[in-house]
């Protein structure tokens, strides 16, 4: 969302400010969650979208509910949007479970939260056929494994992008080309990274190249030896950290004030800082990058399901996809947004890899929830609970 962002996870304190068990859900339960739509007797999913209920309560990454696309949506649908920004995927999961899960209608979940929400019965299946632009999404994001289980869709893909290395061009020389720079004593007290357990994956990705003897092949599937190596690297980094940032705006302030000169970031921060005349650039280092692929998901107890469906349809359109992509600095799920991006901001489609090849998409190690079952058929990986525990202990 931490994300870049979309993007850390991406503290939730702002509204409309600047800016990633069991699967089965009974069909009747799904029907009850959508009281004002047409229901198919076969799937239990709605077959049409009814009249909006008048409001929509969302949990979102900072920068995902901007007035330029929210205000037209409200005018067109009558659904008044109330958005709460979350600073991490962990926070999103917690917020979605508040008040019995009925406080919010939807969430812009990243891949390290979406499966937790599905398996925790916090979100409900949706009918993607009610979203006209879903058919235009890139193939990899129509039914991706982070939001679609055994053919059942639990949300609509939105945007995706890489986590980047952000640096002040006047203070950091030579130009950094490796994630090693954020672990270097050279920048002691001037480094900032997301306040997010998923940072362990970023450390693991770096170590996969820096220490090949660890044999790390997937930064989210770590045995105890690999996991401890990543955590130890982050412990060594801790004295260098100025602040672990929660909101994107926290990191923006650190760079504006000169309190940080290098760190892990999202393109959103880069765009905002450049607009504010702060001398920064970002890079995808030679080791590669982790990243996010976000999904709008509907609460299992949504009070305004029609407005949520209308919102998912709205943000899937080429124009809104283009607006958000440019604003945040990410890539649309809908490639029909690419020419609109170039009209709004010449060259932006190429800049953010809109319509990029599948090989580029596959080169990003997208967030996913760490589980004990490793890809090697073993059950010896550290699950997300251990990641959370290690991160909490690390920060003290």
Regions found by a protein language model. Give the residues of each.
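Short, low-complexity disordered leader/linker segments with a strong preference
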Residues: 1-55
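Early extracytoplasmic/lumenal segment of secretory-pathway proteins
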Residues: 43-117
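Conserved C-terminal helix/tail region of periplasmic/extracytoplasmic solute-binding proteins
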Residues: 362-396
